């Protein structure tokens, strides 16, 4: 079942950890593409110097962060790679969780074509399908078109994985500093990256 609106409310760090093991789903041209979330990063603007919304900075790009939890915040890095975030916290509190890595589940042929334009992949290429924020967006067909979309929609949502199928029994959740935020002064050291230790699709050990 889809995660209800209440799933995204509450402390952003707790929501980030709850997202691990759940399934990110995007329906593209009627075909379901999905993956199990294995790595995330929490961003707690306006006090977090690593957040786009640090200091309450409000722009056309970040406006969705100030809205209701349970919406998609998508942005571009380096002018070419999309990053997908889940908005958390109450209206007016611009916080969110970046989805950093997935284990592919549904629509794997479409995911392969989206990433490599072929379906016969090496083991290394397969592991690289969704082990990074830009890679998973390309794989699932997530673009700026999805910015601001409610995660209650039929085409883009988080699917809750039943306890008996949840991979949390196989992997330990580890916390550590977030990646590629050297500009963020003391926030560089916040242990707000959460991932399944030892999972093959985690982007960085």
From Swiss-Prot:
Keyword DNA repair: yes
Name assigned to this protein: Putative 3-methyladenine DNA glycosylase
Organism: Bacillus cereus (strain 03BB102)
InterPro entries cross-referenced by the UniProt entry: Formyl_transferase-like_C_sf, MPG, MPG_sf
Family: Belongs to the DNA glycosylase MPG family.
GO MF annotation terms: alkylbase DNA N-glycosylase activity; DNA binding
Family annotation (HAMAP family): 3MGH (MF_00527)
Enzyme Commission number(s) of this protein: 3.2.2.-
GO BP terms: base-excision repair
